[in-house]
A protein has these predicted regions:
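N-terminal beta-strand motif that seeds the catalytic metal site of vicinal oxygen chelate
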Residues: 1-16, 125-144
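Long, continuous compositionally biased terminal/linker segments
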Residues: 43-81
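Short beta->alpha transition motifs characteristic of CBS
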Residues: 104-105, 111, 122-129
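Short coil/loop residues immediately preceding or within conserved phosphate-binding loops
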Residues: 36, 66, 107
Length: 144
Protein backbone atom coordinates (compact mmCIF):
# COMPACT_ATOMS: atom_id res chain seq x y z
CA UNK A 1 0.00 0.00 0.00
CA UNK A 2 2.16 2.90 1.22
CA UNK A 3 5.93 3.10 1.03
CA UNK A 4 6.54 6.17 3.17
CA UNK A 5 5.18 9.48 4.38
CA UNK A 6 7.24 12.65 4.06
CA UNK A 7 6.67 15.75 6.20
CA UNK A 8 8.65 18.92 5.62
CA UNK A 9 10.08 21.00 8.43
CA UNK A 10 11.87 24.31 8.80
CA UNK A 11 13.88 23.16 11.84
CA UNK A 12 15.07 19.54 11.75
CA UNK A 13 16.43 19.40 15.32
CA UNK A 14 13.16 20.74 16.73
CA UNK A 15 11.11 18.35 14.57
CA UNK A 16 13.24 15.34 15.61
CA UNK A 17 12.69 16.12 19.31
CA UNK A 18 8.94 16.53 18.67
CA UNK A 19 8.49 13.32 16.68
CA UNK A 20 10.71 11.29 19.04
CA UNK A 21 8.34 12.25 21.89
CA UNK A 22 5.14 11.77 19.90
CA UNK A 23 5.97 8.48 18.15
CA UNK A 24 7.20 6.67 21.30
CA UNK A 25 3.70 6.00 22.77
CA UNK A 26 2.72 4.52 19.39
CA UNK A 27 5.64 2.06 19.34
CA UNK A 28 7.24 3.88 16.40
CA UNK A 29 11.03 4.25 16.70
CA UNK A 30 13.53 6.54 15.03
CA UNK A 31 15.78 4.57 12.71
CA UNK A 32 19.15 5.54 11.19
CA UNK A 33 19.01 7.86 8.20
CA UNK A 34 21.77 8.18 5.63
CA UNK A 35 20.55 11.68 4.78
CA UNK A 36 21.87 14.57 6.86
CA UNK A 37 18.80 16.77 6.38
CA UNK A 38 16.25 14.01 7.12
CA UNK A 39 15.20 11.79 10.03
CA UNK A 40 13.15 8.61 9.79
CA UNK A 41 10.80 6.62 12.06
CA UNK A 42 9.26 3.18 11.65
CA UNK A 43 7.33 0.66 13.72
CA UNK A 44 9.67 -2.38 13.99
CA UNK A 45 8.93 -4.93 11.29
CA UNK A 46 6.32 -2.78 9.55
CA UNK A 47 6.05 -0.31 6.73
CA UNK A 48 5.61 2.51 5.88
CA UNK A 49 8.33 4.83 7.13
CA UNK A 50 7.86 8.40 8.29
CA UNK A 51 10.45 10.82 6.94
CA UNK A 52 10.78 14.36 8.34
CA UNK A 53 13.23 16.79 6.81
CA UNK A 54 14.14 19.93 4.95
CA UNK A 55 12.48 20.16 1.51
CA UNK A 56 14.74 19.12 -1.37
CA UNK A 57 13.79 22.22 -3.39
CA UNK A 58 15.24 24.48 -0.65
CA UNK A 59 11.90 26.33 -0.36
CA UNK A 60 10.34 26.82 3.11
CA UNK A 61 8.27 23.91 4.37
CA UNK A 62 4.54 24.59 4.81
CA UNK A 63 1.48 22.47 5.52
CA UNK A 64 -1.04 21.63 2.84
CA UNK A 65 -4.72 22.40 3.34
CA UNK A 66 -6.70 19.18 3.70
CA UNK A 67 -3.55 17.09 4.18
CA UNK A 68 -3.18 14.96 7.30
CA UNK A 69 -0.98 12.11 8.52
CA UNK A 70 -2.77 9.47 10.61
CA UNK A 71 -0.88 7.06 12.88
CA UNK A 72 -2.49 3.90 14.23
CA UNK A 73 -2.30 3.22 17.96
CA UNK A 74 -2.66 -0.09 19.77
CA UNK A 75 -5.09 1.30 22.36
CA UNK A 76 -7.03 4.36 23.48
CA UNK A 77 -4.35 4.83 26.14
CA UNK A 78 -1.69 5.05 23.41
CA UNK A 79 -3.79 7.71 21.62
CA UNK A 80 -4.08 9.65 24.88
CA UNK A 81 -0.32 9.36 25.52
CA UNK A 82 0.66 10.41 21.99
CA UNK A 83 -1.69 13.39 22.19
CA UNK A 84 -0.31 14.40 25.61
CA UNK A 85 3.27 14.03 24.36
CA UNK A 86 2.46 16.19 21.34
CA UNK A 87 0.84 18.95 23.41
CA UNK A 88 3.75 18.85 25.90
CA UNK A 89 6.18 19.16 22.98
CA UNK A 90 4.45 22.30 21.71
CA UNK A 91 1.78 20.99 19.32
CA UNK A 92 -1.48 22.88 18.79
CA UNK A 93 -4.67 21.07 19.78
CA UNK A 94 -6.96 20.27 16.83
CA UNK A 95 -9.24 17.80 18.65
CA UNK A 96 -8.79 16.18 22.05
CA UNK A 97 -8.87 12.37 22.36
CA UNK A 98 -12.34 10.90 22.12
CA UNK A 99 -14.75 8.66 20.26
CA UNK A 100 -15.65 9.67 16.72
CA UNK A 101 -18.60 7.35 15.95
CA UNK A 102 -19.47 9.35 12.82
CA UNK A 103 -16.37 7.75 11.22
CA UNK A 104 -16.88 4.17 12.45
CA UNK A 105 -18.00 2.29 15.58
CA UNK A 106 -15.18 2.22 18.14
CA UNK A 107 -13.19 4.91 16.28
CA UNK A 108 -11.15 6.78 18.92
CA UNK A 109 -8.81 9.55 17.87
CA UNK A 110 -7.06 12.83 18.58
CA UNK A 111 -5.73 15.59 16.33
CA UNK A 112 -2.84 18.05 16.67
CA UNK A 113 -0.77 20.36 14.50
CA UNK A 114 2.97 19.76 14.77
CA UNK A 115 5.53 22.52 15.23
CA UNK A 116 5.42 23.32 11.49
CA UNK A 117 1.61 23.34 11.32
CA UNK A 118 1.15 19.86 9.78
CA UNK A 119 -2.04 18.11 10.91
CA UNK A 120 -1.35 14.82 12.71
CA UNK A 121 -3.98 12.27 13.77
CA UNK A 122 -3.62 9.41 16.28
CA UNK A 123 -6.29 6.70 15.97
CA UNK A 124 -7.35 3.44 17.55
CA UNK A 125 -10.24 1.40 16.21
CA UNK A 126 -11.61 -0.76 19.02
CA UNK A 127 -14.24 -3.44 18.74
CA UNK A 128 -17.01 -3.70 21.35
CA UNK A 129 -14.67 -6.00 23.33
CA UNK A 130 -12.22 -3.12 23.83
CA UNK A 131 -9.55 -4.84 21.73
CA UNK A 132 -7.92 -2.84 18.96
CA UNK A 133 -8.92 -3.95 15.49
CA UNK A 134 -6.69 -3.81 12.42
CA UNK A 135 -6.85 -0.64 10.30
CA UNK A 136 -9.72 -0.58 7.82
CA UNK A 137 -11.37 1.85 5.47
CA UNK A 138 -13.40 4.64 7.02
CA UNK A 139 -17.01 5.26 6.18
CA UNK A 140 -17.12 9.03 6.04
CA UNK A 141 -20.38 10.96 6.33
CA UNK A 142 -21.75 12.43 3.10
CA UNK A 143 -20.34 15.87 2.41
CA UNK A 144 -23.09 18.12 1.15
Amino acid sequence: MSSHLTIGTRDLARAVAFYDAVMAPLGIERIPSKYQAWASWQRPGEAPKLWVGLPFNKEPAHQGNGWMAAFSASSRKAVDEAYAAAISAGAQDEGAPGLRPHFAPGYYGAYVRDLDGNKIHFVCREEATGAASPPHALSLPNAE
